[in-house]
Amino acid sequence: MSSSPSTQQFKQRLDEHHQWPCTYMFKFIVPLQQTQKILDLFESRDELHTRPSRYGRYMSVTARCTVSSSDEVVAVYQAAAQVQGVISL
């Protein structure tokens, strides 16, 4: 599977700013009904925090976990993109 130019640029920037393995923070905003799908991406990860929005329609999900490469970071974002309504921050 080939990566898009924007994915390649993102991976290059990650490699320039991180030494692997390292702790990386993922942050998502997701409709409340889809929260578990995002949580499932991080079931064996180091640290996971959730916080509901003011009116309870959305959930903020923050995960800090050890990743071994920019490819692993991109894979998480690509998996999260499959969740309907997710916003990756």
Question: What label would you give each PLM region?
Answer:
Residues M1-S60, T66-L89:
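Long, contiguous binding/interaction regions
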